[in-house]
Amino acid sequence: MLEKTFALLNDIPGGTYVPDEKKCYDDAEIEQLSQILKRLLWAPSQIRKKLQQAGVTIIPCNFYSEIPSIEDIERSFDPPVQNFDLIFDDSGMKEFLAELHQFSHEFDPPREAIGGGSYSWEGNPFSFSDAMAYYCMIRRYRPATIIEVGAGWSTLVADLALKANAAGEIICIEPFPPEFLRGIDSVKTLIERPVQEIPPAFFDASLRDGDFLFIDSTHTVKHGSDCLHLYLSVLPRLSRSVFIHAHDIRLPATFPLNELRDKHVYWTEQYLLMAYLIDNSRTRVQYGSTYHFLRNRQQLNAFMHGRFHAGGGSLWFSQKGAPSA
């Protein structure tokens, strides 16, 4: 089955965009496959569960689908991209970055990976200006406690900064921890459970004024997701004044066309985050790697000192404590 189509795909790496005029499939084979998939679309859940265990989900493609069609994705890039200025204060964010800059000369890890649970710029998903900003945030604001929801390479950065402060500890909530996480000195608690299982009261009891909540989630807004728990249950109930981080946030832009169309990146966390921030008198956006890359690149480049590429997906905001009842 699909012999002709697979022959056409042999020299095309996965995730590669192929324009419509360069056909990479056999019509008859794709029609046959479509009929099979339509039959399986409404198959008993045990069949669909088996497919999901193999890493494949079959879902309907229609007006109500939460996964955008390729036509919808391509069409959405025709008009100008919404700039989402409702949550950004340009002058305030530039001043905040200038405050962080005073510590940026300290953070100078090796460029190439050296292994052994040591941080390097290359070979990890938490790099670019995100890593520099995290280090400088910790050095500038000296949190006593950091809760990391999603831990790993970012924890190595935090450990370096906390050691420079000579104070502070990390609580990691990570259901699939890398082995090196267990050997990081600043990690005092490792909770190997999904964050959805952690009640909001735990966060409120663990964080004091000036502490950090670092979120690097699945980035998905769906039934039972970590994002729903964090943004709808945890954050509104925090009673202390804290700094909050979210990762892989591209605001004020959307995700690039190639990531949506060719890499299946349909992350929607940033839109729930934006809804949380709009007209929220308790919050103020302080730093955004993408924001500065798009609108303040000269200052962001200076912040990096030429050590690695500027940019990234970190967004930091402050949240005031809840008023007393």
Model-derived regions, located:
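A short alpha-helical cap/connector motif
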Residues: 2-245, 249-325
